[in-house]
């Protein structure tokens, strides 16, 4: 594509950077130039109209108010466009002008949104909602300290009204259940915890599995064991930092990343692969840590990025080895509906959870790639709950077929979204395989 006839060049400005270690990253004038350029290119392309509301909002401003003049968009309207992005990453996957594809325009809309949020939240106090949603480890610890009361109250109308009015968490949003026992406590009890020991793999169970659904982690350990994969569990891991970073909180992201690197790198340097159960966490460690950390931490992040795998991805890579186990006691169902999470698609590594289930069980699998609309904390917020349901409707409808009784997704939060809006909670691929190995 050649440069268009407007006064705004499609070529990168001198303000182009996606690296927060670069002083230019924090220059608001430089950011505004890049936003203007990006809006101009997106206005001429419009391939991403079907994803989040950022693009329809941008196009509505240009078509209905400003006759296509990007320069007329006001700062508050830019804020509205940025707020509608929930970091699904699908626009970057599909963009023909991306850095990933080596195009000279070097577009990355999600990273531009992150930059905007980082600049506009820098040195400002965080809201109570952002403190709670951006720190799932702390929120879960508080919930567990209530001895089960939090789980009860999260389903009581008056309490949900309070959460909506004072925290901005939608009263109708199905919230995750908090487990009485963490995955780490279970692993400690079974003597699975190891420190700086040589292991083939080490598990990053994720904050969701740690606090909300330890069973997924247990199933993962079980499936790895069935395939003779040596896996170490470790103490003290923190959230990957994505909930904080989606709000522009770079400081918390970097602190969590540094903490996790301190624990994981000794294993990585001995040759261990790191298996993270949630695609979002894999994406953060594979793509975001190396780009967002600085100094020695960036070097360590690159080592981790080379070692990170999804459990299904790791098992798929050993499928031709003699230890790979296809001896099952139960076929879950003849046909399965599989949802591919956005952050798995963003990595470009294929759908190994789906492929693994098909290879081991022989089930026919229908694949649905539309976004479910949950996207981290987006679906929880009062201002975006309805939009998340609307955005996810195609995926809800796509999963429903008369011949499928079992639904699968690699993302536990997507499973929560399907449970609420489609009436079926998909299982994790590791849980499907664990059942297949054991059930009769």
Describe the residue ranges of each PLM region.
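Cysteine-centered iron-sulfur cluster-binding motifs in ferredoxin-type domains/subunits
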Residues: 36-55, 77-101, 116, 140, ...
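Short N-terminal secondary-structure initiator segments
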Residues: 2-11, 30-41, 48, 173-190
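Non-heme iron-sulfur electron-transfer modules
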Residues: 2-24, 50-84, 98-128, 427-433
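Intrinsically disordered, low-complexity regions enriched in small/polar residues
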Residues: 12, 20, 53, 57, ...
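Short, intrinsically disordered, charge-biased short linear motifs at domain edges
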Residues: 26-40, 70-82, 225-227, 357-360
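Iron-sulfur cluster-binding electron-transfer modules in prokaryotic oxidoreductases
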Residues: 103, 107-440
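Short low-complexity stretches enriched in small and charged residues
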Residues: 2-11, 44-50, 155-164, 230
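A short alpha-helix capping/helix-coil boundary motif
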Residues: 16-19, 28, 60-62, 71, ...
